[in-house]
Amino acid sequence: MQVDVQNTTVISADGSSIKLGKYSGEVILVVNVASYCGNTAQYEDLQKLHDLYSSKGLRILAFPCNDFGKQEPDSLSEIKDFCTTKYGVEFEIYEKVHAKGNTTEPYTTLNKVEPEGDVEWNFEKFLIGKDSKVIARFKPGVKPFDENLIAAIEVALDS
């Protein structure tokens, strides 16, 4: 089933509701993130992706999540401070979400992507095309510079 996020509403860091359709015409990489996780160092490469591809139309949207091992207990302001201080993060960090069980958007919608089901762990990635349709789902162990992820990003940007 092809999943469309055009009308999916998320909560920004300032508390306002935003439809992901706002990013139509751009490629989006949605990532659930955590500050105290074995995968936290992926922030560094996510920022490098942002540096390399944001001018070409890639938007990285990070959604802090405390569902996995309680690895994101901090407030949003503490999370943002950690990300900017330690990793120089400039991409967008949204309000905390639930990615498994009683999910919140965008995961209520994204968890319908094959293989359907809850996000497995922190730093699972969803690549969304310019048409707001999900192109691919990448498990948490897939690093930001994995050749398959980079290839998918480049194809999406060129489409």
Positions of predicted regions on the chain:
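Conserved helix-turn-beta segment immediately C-terminal to the redox Cys motif
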Residues: 26-27, 35-36, 40-64, 84-87
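N-terminal "domain-start" segment that seeds a small globular fold
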Residues: 1-21, 41
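Thiol-based oxidoreductase modules, predominantly thioredoxin-like and allied folds used
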Residues: 57-74, 90-101
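Acidic-and-aromatic substrate-binding clefts and catalytic sites of carbohydrate-active enzymes
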Residues: 37-40, 68-71, 144
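Thiol-/selenol-based redox modules, centered on thioredoxin-like
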Residues: 108-159
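Short, internal strand/loop/helix patches
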Residues: 77-122
